[in-house]
A protein has these predicted regions:
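Bacterial Sec-dependent N-terminal signal peptides
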Residues: 1-7, 13-52
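Secreted, disulfide-rich extracellular signaling modules
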Residues: 12-13, 236, 299-302
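Generic detector of well-ordered alpha-helical segments enriched in charged/polar residues
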Residues: 42-46, 242, 337-345
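Generic recognition of flexible, low-complexity loop/linker segments
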Residues: 44-45, 73-74, 295-296
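Short, surface-exposed loop and linker segments with low hydrophobicity and enrichment for Pro/Ser/Thr
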Residues: 49-52, 296-305
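Chitinase-like catalytic core of GlcNAc-active glycosidases
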Residues: 52-284, 305, 309, 314, ...
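Extracytoplasmic/luminal low-complexity segments enriched in Pro/Gly and acidic/polar residues
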Residues: 275-300
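Short, low-complexity, Pro/Ser/Thr/Gly-rich segments in the mature regions of secreted, periplasmic
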Residues: 330-352
Length: 352
């Protein structure tokens, strides 16, 4: 077992998270006192996020309940060291006229808008728009002209809201916009977003079953694989993650590959029981290893991965871990966002 290490940039929230233990029902809210730090801390945090490291990535929707007293429903309550947030409940706006037609998936959420831009400005967190990438049920025709118009529509949604990029959820399920057409779609967007655009804006593709073509790779910053445990699953092994990466390893560098869990289903324990390649089932703190932290610890045999993360990770704000004695946990107090906080530490351990 690796030596216990505390990543000092994990955030004041993770270091000072002595909280009252909560019930295991997600609807029970905890009020978390907002913690602050000095400017040097935030400068170090921003510098860390600009460095070459495996990132923490997540789809987040909790901000849509901006009136909630729970920190789990606010951008400012997120772990400081999350690198990229994909907006799963629309783009927050502070301009009600901007969202009248909702053409760009914008929502009038002024509190969320301010908090989102605070974590971008102060904590260096990048925030990207997210869309399920299908042309059906849109206003755009299934033609080359329609393809380009749809691509430019998504680019504009990023630029007019000054976001940090775009996450395309590639799950065509028979949609016209797939295969070679999706590659062309990526090439168009790639003129304005992604590594070939020189814009500083991210272009991300996330996917589950259908795999994007290798020709998309030069245009994309990260490929995020939904390595989701089924809702009724109880365990996962590192070998499963390796197979997920091997499917694209001939053309996708490991540093572009992000592995993610379905935390909306598996929030109580931080995933399902996880077994590493060497048979280990314990984390660096002596607690039973579950798949979110297991994904953070894992790397493909080809090299360091791009990162780890989760879908609907806000569900884990109310957790009993790592103090759930029924699972074999060894600690005394629960930690909000336990799996993400500890996963970041496992993935990027501090140096002695």
């Amino acid at each position: 077992m690796r030596k216990r290490l505390l990543y000092t940039l994990l955030g004041v929230g993770s270091i000072l998270c002595c909280m009252v233990a909560c019930d295991t029902e997600i609807e029970n809210e905890i009020l978390q006192k907002e913690l602050t730090a000095d400017e040097q801390y935030y400068q170090n945090l921003r510098d860390y996020k600009k460095s070459d490291h495996a990132i923490c990535y997540g789809w987040y929707a909790g901000y849509s309940s901006e009136g909630s007293p729970s920190a789990g429903n606010h951008f400012t309550g997120l772990p400081d060291s999350i690198d990229i947030i994909s907006l799963w409940s629309g783009i927050p706006s502070n301009n009600p006229r901007y969202v009248e037609a909702n053409t760009y998936n914008e929502r009038y959420l002024p509190v969320a808008y301010e908090e989102m831009n605070y974590i971008r400005r102060v904590k260096g967190t990048r925030v990207v728009a997210c869309t399920i990438c299908r042309i059906k049920n849109t206003e755009f025709p299934k033609t080359d002209a329609g393809l380009e118009a749809y691509a430019m529509h998504l680019v504009k949604s990023v630029l007019r809201n000054d976001l940090d990029g775009l996450d395309l959820d590639y799950e065509p399920e028979g949609d016209w916009l797939s295969g070679d057409k999706f590659t062309k779609f990526i090439e168009i967007i790639g003129r304005y977003l992604g590594p070939k655009s020189n814009s500083g804006k991210l272009l991300i593709v996330d996917f589950y079953g259908d795999v994007p073509a290798s020709a998309t790779e030069p245009y994309v910053d990260y490929f995020v694989r939904q390595c989701y445990s089924k809702e009724d699953a109880t365990s996962k092994r590192a070998s499963e993650l390796q197979r997920e990466y091997d499917e694209i390893s001939s053309w996708c560098p490991p540093s572009k590959f992000i592995v993610t869990e379905q935390m909306g289903w598996h929030w109580r324990n931080g995933g399902v029981k996880f077994t590493e390649a060497d048979g280990n089932q314990i984390d660096s703190w002596g607690n039973p290893l579950y798949s979110v932290i297991g994904m953070a610890r894992w790397n493909p045999t080809q090299g360091r991965k791009g990162g780890f993360g989760g879908f609907y990770f806000e569900y884990e704000y109310n957790t009993t871990r790592p103090a759930n004695k029924s699972l074999g946990d060894t600690e005394m107090e629960a930690i909000p966002y336990y799996s993400l906080r500890r996963g970041i530490q496992e993935q990027n351990p501090a140096l002695d």
